[in-house]
């Protein structure tokens, strides 16, 4: 996937539209420790996309077929 560069500025609506259209994944890992003692550890993976974008990629990797079958 190539990074597209533009010289024009984008409005907030255009940025949100692009994020929902393409999707974005934020992978975070935080560790808080004091004197070598780990107090807090947080791991998170946040996916932001429109339902249409999610379903398109979920279908491509076969996630929608297993969800459609009754247990």
From Swiss-Prot:
Keyword terms: Gas vesicle
Subcellular location: Gas vesicle shell
Transport keyword on record: no
Single GO MF descriptor: structural molecule activity
GO cellular component: gas vesicle shell; vesicle membrane
Swiss-Prot/TrEMBL induction comment: Constitutively transcribed when grown in a 12 hour light/dark regime at 2000 umol photon/m(2)/s; decreased light, growth at 38 degrees Celsius or both increased transcripts up to 23-fold.
InterPro entries in the cross-refs: Gas-vesicle_GvpA-like (IPR000638), Gas_vesicle_GvpA (IPR047870), GvpA (IPR050530), GvpA-like_CS (IPR018493)
Subunit-structure text: The gas vesicle shell is 2 nm thick and consists of a single layer of this protein. It forms helical ribs nearly perpendicular to the long axis of the vesicle.
Family statement drawn from the similarity comment of this UniProt entry: Belongs to the gas vesicle GvpA family.
Known role: Gas vesicles are hollow, gas filled proteinaceous nanostructures found in some microorganisms. During planktonic growth they allow positioning of the organism at a favorable depth for light or nutrient acquisition. GvpA forms the protein shell.
Official protein name in the record: Gas vesicle protein A
Annotated organism of origin: Nostoc sp. (strain PCC 7120 / SAG 25.82 / UTEX 2576)
Organism phylogeny: Bacteria, Bacillati, Cyanobacteriota, Cyanophyceae, Nostocales
């Amino acid at each position: 996937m190539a990074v597209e560069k533009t010289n024009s500025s984008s409005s907030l609506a255009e940025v949100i539209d692009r994020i929902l259209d393409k999707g974005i994944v934020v992978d975070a890992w935080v560790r808080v420790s004091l004197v070598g003692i780990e107090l807090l550890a947080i791991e998170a993976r946040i996916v932001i996309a429109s339902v249409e974008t999610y379903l398109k990629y979920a279908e491509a990797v076969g996630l929608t077929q297993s969800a459609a079958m009754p247990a």
